[in-house]
Amino acid sequence: VVVMNKAIFIKDVFDYEKSQDWKYKGSKPAIIDLYADWCGPCRMVAPIMKELAKEYADKIVVYKVNVDKEKELAALFNATSIPLFVFIPMSGEPQLFRGAADKATYKKAIDDFLLKTE
């Protein structure tokens, strides 16, 4: 799990300062977990995301964004409620997943959306 700030986001994910048209820069699909330390459901999901990051280590990247520290990134994804997960496939638009869920739900989203082959 990579803790992300604006500089890392612009370098590794998407440079929204240069373009409004989504273009993912990463080499593997990704999940961005937008959270806050005070958020109970966020704390509940954190160990699940860590496990998934290990299980899928060679296939996806999992980033964490603290919305209290990275307000610009929170605003970019309209993170009005957390946890908020941004699932980023290699091509196509990212999909937002709001709220906490169980591990099986996240695994299904990873397998069906991020790792799906045409």
Can you say where each PLM-predicted feature lies in the sequence?
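C-type cytochrome heme c attachment motif
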Residues: 37-44, 84
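Structural signal for short hydrophobic segments within the conserved structured cores
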Residues: 2, 61-63, 95-98
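Short pre-active-site segment immediately N-terminal to redox-active cysteine/selenocysteine motifs
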Residues: 27-30, 34-38, 81
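Thiol-based oxidoreductase modules, predominantly thioredoxin-like and allied folds used
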Residues: 34, 45-53, 57-72
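Sec-exported extracytoplasmic/periplasmic mature domains
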Residues: 14, 18, 44, 54-57, ...
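A short glycine-leucine-enriched loop at secondary-structure breakpoints
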Residues: 43, 76-80
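Non-catalytic, surface beta->alpha helical segment in thiol-disulfide oxidoreductase systems
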Residues: 81, 86-118
